[in-house]
Amino acid sequence: MRPILSIKGLSVEYLSPRGRVKAVRNVNLEVYKGEILFLVGESGAGKSTLGLTLLKLLPEGIAKVVGGEVIYHRDDGGNLNILKLRKGRLRRFRWKEVAMVFQGAMNSLNPIMKIKDQMYDVIKDHGVRLSKREAYKKIEELLAMVRLDAKRVLKSYPHQLSGGMKQRVMIAMSLLLDPKLLILDEPTTALDVLTQKNIMNVLKDIRDKLHLTMIFITHDLSLAAELADRIAIMYAGSIVEVGSVEQIFYRPKHPYTHGLLKSVPKLTSEIGKLESIPGFPPDMINLPPGCKFHPRCVFRRDICMEKEPFLQKVEENHYTACWRWRDIFGEE
Amino acid sequence: MGKSENTPLLELRGVYKAYKVGGFLRKVKVNAIEDIWLSLGEADIISLVGESGCGKTTTGKVAVGLLKPDKGEVLYKGKNIWEMTKEEFKEFRRNVQMMHQDPYSSLNPMLTVYKTLSAPLFRHGLASDREEAVERIARLLRLVGLTPPEEYMEKYPHQLSGGERQRVAFARTLSLNPKLIVADEPVSMIDVSLRASILNLMLDMREKFKVSYVYITHDLITARYFSRKHLLMIMYLGSIVETGQTDRIIKEPLHPYTQVLLSALPEPDPRITRSKKLIALRSLDVPSLLRMPTGCKFHPRCPFFKKGLCDVKRPTLIEVESGRRVACHLYGS
């Protein structure tokens, strides 16, 4: 498997009146071509900050990359260090190589422009050499791919569309310049179950038809269960476990992942009383020493309070940042 | 005490509530809820489930007396709450509490936990001085798992995490020893790893103090967990479409809307969720409340739509088996 993106030792901090918020801490991760990788974590885990960093979209002056790099591997074999890109190249990079859809992105549509004109502008403004006719053909194809009635949608203003339709317009729009990697940050979070299901199906279609690589950021394990090839679990700014969807759901090797899975209720299977993870997430300004999960971990030993664990190999493709995974869960 | 053993704690009888919407030239009346029936006794739980705009929150507000219904009755221990004396109404409001979704905005940022929790105690005469209040609050904080309580009392909301805030909000709800709590999406803004603990805490209070709950949520999975052997009510565009014991509905949903909803719900298990078969809707668009469909409100989207019946006649809620009611022409009505 060839990586499309390599994140190496990445750390990001925010400046706050109380001190430095260590939002992303020493993240190492490869994203492989054609896969759907889920970044799963709870609020404050650093998943959205990581997503923004991948496109160099961090708010300037407040957030700072304090270490590491993000390398994008182009189709032609060239490598781009994203964090070093300057304005002009960054602009092209953002739509043509990597595109992003945010939670509530539908609210960023221009309310006084028809969808048709907004979508055409994206193509025109990025200097793509397409005739007007070709451009509209492309727009219609993409709207069909996200299961929208192009005829109706194109002549609509945003307020004439439902939230789910607008979010699908945003997804179609993000695909206009044929990006190779799509980053989705909680794209279905504010939407109803049925609308959410529809968007998940649209993303499946896109994967099957365009063979795009996707990074899907969410707090919702159910969505990962539905669509992920691989999952990276984040806690307190770091990746604590990464593996295939099967490895993470059925053979977790980190106490946090394990606890998370046991704390979510299921619909069809029989369940007893849910167990929640004791305690609360850490203060990102005053992080505990050693493993950041140790204050909530029932398996902790002295070493966990002293030294922060790094990602260790469990089996092929499966890594966990826990000193005691063998004792707790056993080998595969 | 109630009139008899069988008098429910809270009853909604055929409740309607409409809102006026639109500009100043053309105000339109929109029915937020129509013909809602609900009854619950001591230590009962009912989950109200539906998507945004289905009227579940309005139903909750009517139940706690925050909104006056246009039609129908709200009875507390057999008494219409809108015909109560001032004293009776005050007692009703103390016994029936609402718990909100957002622990970030439901707590006053200027007040310490002590101030937040002591105010209702003093107001309702449950504490006469600081010492008494501190003692009671310490007990409450321990009850909701915030220990050591002395430390939490002096904290402001911004010094607490979302999970801690929701526990403070819950402690405030409990402080007046309510008989019934209407909880509107109490865990939807809480981190996944803490949700179970809040739900378990609420269930513990039911065990300990026989508190009853109306649990309002869009999330069928937590509703199933919270009200398994109790009642579930599925709402769609302001009406009840199906009601009955939670586990039975989840196992065998009768109303097409419930069936579609269950088939679309992702589950935290890859094998289960990937082998689910989606029941497709005829239309994805939720009709506007301003243009409510004729006949059955679900007919424009229903996969089992029968022309000439579903678009003409509104189905009534009928009992199909003991304790299970459905509003759908597939089952008579």
Feature locations, PLM:
Chain B
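ABC transporter nucleotide-binding domains
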Residues: 1-252, 263, 326, 331-333
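Charged, flexible cofactor/metal-binding loops and thiol motifs
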Residues: 8, 245-333
